[in-house]
Structure formats: C-alpha cells, structure tokens
C-alpha cells in the first residue's frame, strides 16, 4: 500500500488519488448509463426511420438489453479474478477501459447486428474488469485506521451518481434527437476522458497501488490457465456456430435463452461450492443459509428495478405524454431522459435515509425488516403503474408524472435494499469466501436480468395492466414473507443484524 500523508488536503481533504478515481468512475458511468439510456430504442427503431435503428421487435430488443445487463454483472467475477491472479488491479482497470471504449466505438459504426454483438461483448468484458477493481482501488488509498476512508467512499459514490445523472440528458438528447450512432460516439468520448484521467492520475498519485496481482499464478498454473482458456474459447465459438446453423431465423432468441440459463445456473454453483467447502465452519454455514432468502429476495427486487431500461423505457416512449404543458408552458421530453430519475431520486433520498438511520441508532430496523419494506415499496411502485391503464385505458398517452412517482417510490425501496445488501453480504460471508460473497451480491442482479430476458417480452399494450399488477404483487408478497419469517432468519444470522 502506498504511504499516504494524512495532512494532504487537495480533494475535499482526501488523498489526491481519490480525484483520479472519482473522475474515472464519473466518466465510466456517464458512458455506461448514456449508452444504456438509448440502447433499447436503437434496437427497435425502424431501419427506414430518419434516425435509423436495427428494426428488431420490441420484445427481442428488451430481452437483449436484459441479457446485456446480466452478463455485465456476471463478468465482474472474471474481472476480479484477472486482477487477483494475472494483471493486478491497476492494469486490469486500464485494459477494461480500453475494451469499453472500443465497444462504444463499435456501436458508433453503422454495421448493424455484427457491430452490435462485437460492441456488447467488449463492453461486458471491459466493465467486468473495471467496475469491481476501481472500488477496490479506492480502499487501497487509505490505511486501515484512516478516519477519512468512509468519507472517501461517499465522495466516490457521488461521482457515480453524477455521471449517471447527466448521461441520459446529454447522450439521450443527441442519440434520440439527432443520431443514435452520434450518441454512442459521445459515450465513447466519455470513456476516452476516463482513460486519460486514470492514466495521468495513476502515474502521478498512486503508481504502486494495484500494480501487481495479490495472489499471482506460478508459471505452471498460468500455462494451465492459457490452455483452459483456449479450449473454452474454441468450444464457445463452435457452440455459437452450431446455434446459428440449427436455426438462423431464431438464432438471437436461442442465444438469449442459453445465456439466461447460464445467468441462473452460475449462482447455484457458487452456493453449492461454498456449502460443500471444508473451509466453511458450521456457524458460517448457518449464516450462509440465512443469506439464501435475502439473495432470492434481492433477485425479485433487481428484476423489477432493472426493468427501468427495458419495460419502463418502452412505456415512456410509447405511452407517456412527451409534450406536456405545465404552468402554461409546453415542454418536450426525450424518452431517454426518464433514465435520470433513478440516480436523481437516489441523490435526493440518500441524505434522508442516512439521517434517519443515524437518529435511530440501535433502534433502527433489522436487515430483514429493511429488505421486506424495500421489496414492498418496490412492488407498490409497479402497482402505481397500473393506474394509467386502469383509469384511461392503454391506447392513449398518460402523464409523465406517473413515472416520476413510480421512480420516487422505487428508489426509496432501493435505499432499503441495496446498501443493506452490500453490507450484510460481507457480514454473513465465510472467512474463506469473503470476495466470493461480494460477487454473489452482484450475481443477484445478474440472475434477475437473466430472468427478465424471459419475462420482458410478455409486456405489451394488451398486457400492460396485468404485467405491472402481477409483478408488483409478487414484490409485495415476497416482502411480507420476509417480515413473517424474520425470526428464524435472524436466529440463523447469529450476531449479525
């Protein structure tokens, strides 16, 4: 770890390296959420439109976006492993940034489905390499007893939210209003800024941090890894080819189905691996058992929350009034702008929850209660979305304020689930599987989006009310079940609350 001077106050009293990581993550999130804000629209926009897209069916477009999200979170396992065993965190982050940049450049080219699949592959792999490791780098800027650590992470999260907040406004406006490929170009430019900020700042402020892998392979293990990787790549290419040959017309749907299965099976393998490991003590196994209902609940939560870039995006474009008149003034709304409501309400509501938990102290609700209430709020947010269809039918346009209200309630639910889930994942983790348990939390999101790839195609005008109602009720029921069974879960959790 770098020897840091605690008296150095150049970035809100924090180490100067934090500014580098803040800027890197700001631009990476700008790139990620900017692209995601317009991706589904690009996929189903007609090829003959003035702002042409790929002309895919809406159901297929939503499934592709869901699978993309699932693989992004699944790839974080690979990124963490590469940093720990092969390259070190620093080089892994930079390589990931290069791959993301190349992916956005590929999306900016007018080569149709070919460039789409190449681009998504590069962005998925690059994000998996950058995302988990840059958070780890923030921690390495501080010694374990440095009181500035928590504040540093809070500042880092502000960078994430700021990038997420402005991305839909800039990339969305240009992408939908002018040209999709130009919008993707802006996302690529954002990643170039991220790469430059990281390269320049790393050399100046923390050249030694993350330079080497923490658990490097010996030469024999490295050779075996390269052989295994070569075999996996060859098998994947052959499988890809056979899947296409089996049914060219249904290739995309078959590909989505295969990836959905992978997204669901991987967490099961992880749980089995931890439960059967001889390194896990009996007390740790009980805590791991307590984590299962929380993990399953998180899948339900993320399945609803992650539909903001698919189902909610489609609803915003096809069902909301994009030219509302407020206070006598007519506004125009680009549908992609709705994606900024998520980070906006996170920014607005976070201080309220922080102050509430600080005030309650030891009297604040347990993890199980927070999870249950969060899921119930998330379910209620979807029940809110049934009202436009119930009140006025599903053929016309509804007020944009329905989406504002939905996001406000849903983000309140997220603040009860997401930070608590991160925290409890570390607390319930067996000593031998600390990093893997953090990966499990990301896998809950991955699994939820793998499931979404199968259920989002069910959403259409004729099923709108039923879809929102059933999905919302499921969220509420799961939340209620958690509250009912909280005592046996808390008993399994032991001293963790």
Curated annotation (Swiss-Prot):
Subcellular location: Cell membrane
GO BP terms, alphabetized: oligopeptide transport; protein transport
UniProt GO cellular component terms: plasma membrane
Disulfide partners: none
Listed Gene3D superfamilies: MFS general substrate transporter like domains
InterPro entries for this protein: Dipep/tripep_permease, MFS_dom, MFS_trans_sf, MFS_Transporters, POT_fam, PTR2_symporter_CS
UniProt KW keywords: Cell membrane, Membrane, Peptide transport, Protein transport, Transmembrane, Transmembrane helix, Transport
Extracellular topology ranges: 56-64, 112-115, 174-181, 244-254, 313-335, 392-425
Protein's membrane topology: Multi-pass membrane protein
A single MF term (Gene Ontology): peptide transmembrane transporter activity
Functional note: Proton-dependent uptake of di- or tri-peptides.
Residues in the Cytoplasmic compartment per record: 1-36, 84-92, 135-154, 201-224, 274-293, 355-372, 445-497
Family label: Belongs to the major facilitator superfamily. Proton-dependent oligopeptide transporter (POT/PTR) (TC 2.A.17) family.
Source organism: Lactococcus lactis subsp. lactis (strain IL1403)
Record field: transmembrane: 37-55, 65-83, 93-111, 116-134, 155-173, 182-200, 225-243, 255-273, 294-312, 336-354, 373-391, 426-444
Tree of life domain: Bacteria
Main location: membrane
Listed PROSITE patterns: MFS, PTR2_1, PTR2_2
The name this protein goes by in its record: Di-/tripeptide transporter
């Amino acid at each position: 770890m770098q020897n840091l001077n605690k008296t150095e106050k150049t970035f809100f009293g924090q180490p100067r390296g934090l500014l580098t990581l803040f800027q890197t993550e700001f631009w990476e999130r700008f790139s990620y959420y900017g692209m995601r804000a317009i991706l589904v629209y690009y996929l189903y926009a007609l090829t003959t439109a003035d702002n042409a897209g790929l002309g895919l069916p809406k159901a297929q477009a939503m499934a592709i976006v869901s699978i993309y999200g699932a693989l992004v979170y699944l790839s974080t396992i690979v990124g963490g492993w590469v940093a720990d065993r092969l390259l070190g965190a620093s080089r892994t982050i930079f390589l990931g940034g290069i791959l993301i940049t190349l992916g956005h450049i590929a999306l900016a080219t007018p080569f149709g489905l070919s460039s789409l699949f190449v681009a998504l592959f590069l962005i998925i792999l690059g994000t998996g390499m950058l995302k988990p490791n840059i958070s780890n780098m923030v921690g390495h800027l501080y010694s374990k007893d440095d009181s500035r650590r928590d504040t540093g992470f809070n500042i880092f999260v502000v960078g994430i939210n700021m990038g997420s907040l402005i991305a839909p406004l800039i990339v969305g406006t240009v992408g939908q209003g002018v040209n999709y490929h130009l919008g993707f170009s802006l996302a690529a430019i954002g990643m170039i800024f991220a790469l430059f900020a990281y390269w320049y700042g790393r050399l100046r402020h923390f050249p030694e941090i993350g330079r080497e892998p923490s658990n490097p392979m010996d030469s024999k293990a490295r050779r075996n890894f390269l052989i295994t990787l070569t075999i996996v790549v060859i098998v994947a290419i052959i499988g890809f080819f056979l899947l296409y040959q089996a049914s060219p017309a249904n290739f995309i749907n078959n590909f989505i189905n295969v990836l959905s299965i992978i997204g669901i099976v991987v967490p099961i393998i992880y749980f089995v691996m931890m439960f059967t490991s001889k390194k896990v003590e009996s007390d740790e196994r009980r805590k791991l058992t307590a984590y299962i209902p929380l993990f399953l609940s998180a899948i339900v939560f993320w399945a609803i929350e992650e539909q903001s870039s698919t189902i909610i995006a489609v609803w915003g474009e096809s069902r909301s009034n994009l030219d509302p008149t407020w206070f006598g003034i007519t506004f125009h709304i680009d549908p992609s702008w709705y994606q900024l409501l998520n980070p906006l309400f996170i920014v607005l509501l976070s201080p309220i929850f922080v102050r509430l938990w600080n005030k309650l102290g030891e009297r604040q609700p347990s993890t199980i209660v927070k999870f249950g209430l969060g899921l119930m709020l998330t379910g209620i947010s979807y029940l809110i979305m049934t009202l436009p269809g119930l009140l006025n039918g599903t053929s016309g346009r509804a007020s944009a304020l329905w989406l504002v209200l939905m996001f406000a309630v849903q983000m309140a639910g997220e603040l009860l689930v997401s930070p608590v889930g991160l925290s409890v994942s570390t607390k319930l983790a067996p000593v031998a599987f600390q990093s893997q348990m953090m990966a499990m939390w990301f896998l809950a999101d991955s699994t939820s989006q793998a499931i979404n790839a199968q259920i989002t195609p069910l959403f259409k005008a004729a099923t709108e009310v039923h879809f929102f109602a059933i999905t919302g009720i499921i969220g509420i029921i799961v939340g209620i079940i958690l509250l009912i069974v909280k005592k046996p879960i808390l008993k399994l959790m032991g001293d963790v609350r």
